Amino acid sequence: MRMQTKLIHGGISEDATTGAVSVPIYQTSTYRQDAIGRHKGYEYSRSGNPTRFALEELIADLEGGVKGFAFASGLAGIHAVFSLLQSGDHVLLGDDVYGGTFRLFNQVLVKNGLSCTIIDTSDISQIKKAIKPNTKALYLETPSNPLLKITDLAQCASVAKDHGLLTIVDNTFATPYYQNPLLLGADIVAHSGTKYLGGHSDVVAGLVTTNNEALAQEIAFFQNAIGGVLGPQDSWLLQRGIKTLGLRMEAHQKNALCVAEFLEKHPKVERVYYPGLPTHPNYELAKKQMRGFSGMLSFTLKNDSEAVAFVESLKLFILGESLGGVESLVGIPAFMTHACIPKTQREAAGIRDGLVRLSVGIEHEQDLLEDLEQAFAKIG
């Protein structure tokens, strides 16, 4: 089954009891049991809910996993995944990793005895050099947030397996429509379902899947034990969003490429970060391991001090957190999504105060270009 069709018919797409073509919202916290210890598959909605289960089956199907897991947020899912590790374990993280992931690790998980080394994961030599005897996992974002770096998933997974490491991939930017890390050797894939999968800026969710049965059992335990599960209403909204993921991603990518080409030629722009541009250093790798380039891009102005005035002059591009909705969003990572990362560390990774990140929506491309042009005109 091709991906476009799988988005609609994958997982559990219908209700077997009634024939409803949309999975019902099972808005219940508990379930009648036939006898002590005898139930019909569900006993308490933290442990399992039919609406959530349908979503979990769907993400596993889309990513090539054996089991999926739905959480109350992307970070709740990442927390559950990192719970697989033990005190004393060491993890490799990307140097421009999402600020929320950085904060979770460096302010929460360190208290549980975990440690990490920050590296440029798009450079395989840095990964090899950073591996220690107690390194247990390699955590990747590709494309990365916000510099859109591309990491060679197959190569990294091979190195990780040689050293007995788990390869964990945040696939939020690419989505299963454009990239499937499990098929390239990764062990676990995580998503912020809030973003492209939901696609309408109306749900907060996290999804995780794995192609390893033993890992699936452990993640299932932590999902239930920690309890950060996704509710049935949000599970249903996310399933509805996923049905149109293919159409939306094609539109996002078309507009993003148009915007990236416009910015690359603009005299006020210093550099554009978009893997769909031939000038991107990992363009060929992106073409090899992805089926498309998504709708995220970042750029720097020649004058960093103009960045704030520029984004505040935009009208169609909404100044706000998050990404992946049908509407275009703009932000300055240094002051927003990555503000929790120390300034010296941010700048060393290339996240300057003047770096602007765009989540390009599905509006008419000419309207987006005109909005950018009028903002440039306002800053002179």
From Swiss-Prot:
Residues with PTM N6-(pyridoxal phosphate)lysine: 195
Entry superkingdom: Bacteria
Protein localization: Cytoplasm
An MF annotation (GO) of this entry: pyridoxal phosphate binding
SUPFAM superfamilies noted in UniProt: PLP-dependent transferases
BP terms from Gene Ontology: cysteine biosynthetic process via cystathionine; methionine biosynthetic process; transsulfuration
Keywords: Amino-acid biosynthesis, Cytoplasm, Methionine biosynthesis, Pyridoxal phosphate, Transferase
Annotated Pfam families: Cys_Met_Meta_PP
Cofactor: record remark: Binds 1 pyridoxal phosphate per subunit.
Enzyme class: transferase
EC nos: 2.5.1.48
Record GO cellular component, one term: cytoplasm
Cofactor: pyridoxal 5'-phosphate
Reactions that this protein is recorded to catalyse: O-succinyl-L-homoserine + L-cysteine = L,L-cystathionine + succinate + H(+)
Family affiliation: Belongs to the trans-sulfuration enzymes family.
Physiological role: Catalyzes the formation of L-cystathionine from O-succinyl-L-homoserine (OSHS) and L-cysteine, via a gamma-replacement reaction. In the absence of thiol, catalyzes gamma-elimination to form 2-oxobutanoate, succinate and ammonia.
PANTHER family per the UniProt record, alphabetical: CYSTATHIONINE GAMMA-LYASE (PTHR11808:SF15), TRANS-SULFURATION ENZYME FAMILY MEMBER (PTHR11808)
Quaternary structure annotation from Swiss-Prot or TrEMBL: Homotetramer.
Protein name: Cystathionine gamma-synthase
Gene, per the UniProt record: metB
